[in-house]
Every structure is written in C-alpha cells, then in structure tokens.
Design a protein with these regions (language model features):
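Short clusters of hydrophobic/aromatic residues that line enzyme substrate/ligand-binding pockets
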Residues: 11, 28, 35, 46, ...
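Glycine-/charge-enriched secondary-structure boundary and capping motifs
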Residues: 2-8, 61, 66-181
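Internal active-site segments that recognize and position negatively charged phosphoryl groups
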Residues: 18-26, 49-73, 77
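Short amphipathic alpha-helical leader/targeting segments
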Residues: 33-34, 40, 138
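Short, surface-exposed, charged loop/turn segments at secondary-structure junctions
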Residues: 37-42, 82-84
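Glycine-rich anion-binding loops of enzyme active sites
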Residues: 1-34, 150
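Active-site glycine-rich loop that binds ribose-phosphate moieties when present
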Residues: 1-12, 41-58
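Short, surface-exposed recognition loops or helix-turn segments adjacent to catalytic cores
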Residues: 34-35, 69
Length: 181
C-alpha cells in the first residue's frame, strides 16, 4: 500500500505510553486456523484478508501506536513494546475469537490467535479516555474493536510482553511467524 498523509500525522510503533490500552480489530487466529483446516469456513480470511486501511486512517488523532497483525499478535505487540520502550500485559481471555476457535481448548485457540499471523487486523494503543470515541468510530464501520491488555512501564533492561489467563501467567510456546529464518 502506498499513500500520502499529512505531515506529522503518521501513527508509528513507538508512540505508546504506560497506561495505554492495547486494542485489536476483528477476530484473531482465523487465517492460521484456515491454513491447517483448508475446508474451513474461515478459508476466505486466509485467501482474501481485508486490510483495515480505512479504520487505520480514522485512528489518526486517537491511537498512540499501531501496526497490522501479520506475524501474530504476540510478536507484533512485542514490536510496539520494544519501539516504545515499555512492557505489555496481554489478557488471553479477552482475545476476540471466531466461534469456531471458541470451541477449541483455550491453549490451542490462544496459539492460533497469538502466533498464527496473516490476520491483517490492527493492533493499536490508546489512552483509556479515547476508547468510547474509537468504539463509536468502529461501529460506524461495522467493525469490532476489543481491549486485550495494557502497556506498562518497563521493569527490566529488555522489554517484555506478559501473557495472562484469568490473571495467572500463561506460557506461550510460539510467539509468531518468522519470515526469514
């Protein structure tokens, strides 16, 4: 995608602030599930993803940091945390899942949603007081947005993403798709 934007209005990965909410569009894990289940009703999410370009434009003036989820939420959120020099806490039970994925064991559904990639939904951060306005904007585009976590002050030399399931630590086996290994 190539385009123009007003000077100084780009939403980068590095603008998140401690306390910002972590929000995603749509449902996560659909493309990864379809890759492993070719006859799934989710196949179109793999074959013909719908990039959220129009909503990304709406987020100018609201989001403090943003990127698309191409490598899996765990890895892509890590990019925001690193660029912003913050930690992140992600609440597994808040992940927006298609009903097909909701039928899976929580650890399997989380693996698809967090490490699968190719969803091309948006992951963005914003101050909590802007959430109602963003939800209203999303509703006008008939798009779901879900708060999945919060940005935290960095506690160590390296940034980290903490995964929690019902406020208990959650161990993720794979963090995302690697394009060039």
């Amino acid at each position: 995608v190539l385009g123009w934007l007003p000077n100084g209005r780009a939403i980068t990965r590095s603008g998140a602030q401690a306390g910002d909410l972590i929000v995603v569009t749509g449902t996560l894990g659909d493309a990864a599930y379809a890759l492993q289940h070719p006859q799934s009703p989710l196949q179109s999410r793999l074959d013909r993803p719908v990039p959220r370009v129009a909503f990304g434009q709406v987020l100018r003036g609201h989001a403090s940091a943003m990127l698309d989820i191409s490598d899996g939420l765990a890895q892509d959120l890590g990019h925001i945390a690193q660029a912003s020099q913050l930690d992140a806490r992600l609440n597994i039970e808040c992940l927006p899942l298609h009903p097909i994925l909701q039928q899976l064991p929580p650890s399997q559904a989380a693996a698809y949603a967090l490490a699968g990639g190719d969803d091309y939904e948006l992951c963005f951060t914003l101050p909590a007081h802007l959430l109602d306005a963003v939800q209203a904007d999303a509703g006008r585009q008939q798009l779901a947005v879900t708060v999945v976590g919060q940005m935290l002050p960095r506690q160590a030399a390296q940034t980290q993403v903490q995964f929690r399931l019902h406020d208990q630590p959650f161990e993720l086996q794979q963090t995302g798709f690697q394009h060039f290994d």
